[in-house]
């Protein structure tokens, strides 16, 4: 016999943030590698209409054998697997049958009001954004003195249609901004629409992003 009333919370969209404790140890080597890619102008050439004043490398960043790159890849993979375990409630036995498959990885360097329009990551399950250099990201006044979000990542609600009457006020926030912090990794469901707001600062905004799926061992 069911005890009524009951409540079921469904279709949650979880965004996780992790701090890389080895950030300072690898920061300079990673930045040098990113700017070396930029100087050689090996750009992705993908969705250029959605980007402005933004360098995007080719999608093979984690294939480099540099120790700093491989250390960051390991950190991202371990963080991703902890997300998979937490969000699904899997036990250690089942987790031992799974492994992360980072399909694409790339660097972004942004300044001079550079931005990336709203988009999703298709055909993958989880996305990651690692803040290598956050610069002056955060709330800042624009040229007209109006406060705006500078270089934040904005995530949009996947719930597209509802009536915003008094009963639905818990859904009133249709977007949330995450302010970059050096050495922080954000992991999010790839179906979430997200963007990078325009950024300007004395230092470039530098991030490493990736797409992934979770595979099961044979």
What do the predicted segments below correspond to?
Residues 167-218:
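Catalytic core of Fe(II)/2-oxoglutarate
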Residues 2-90, 94, 115:
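Non-heme Fe(II)/2-oxoglutarate
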Residues 89-105:
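A short coil-to-beta-strand element that immediately follows conserved catalytic motifs
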Residues 12-16, 127, 205:
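Short hydrophobic/aromatic beta-strand or adjacent loop that forms the aromatic wall/cage
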Residues 72, 120, 204:
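Hydrophobic (often cysteine-bearing) scaffold residues that line and stabilize catalytic clefts
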Residues 23, 135, 160, 192-194, ...:
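Short, solvent-exposed loop/turn segments at secondary-structure junctions
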Residues 101-185:
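Catalytic core of non-heme Fe(II) oxygenases with the double-stranded beta-helix
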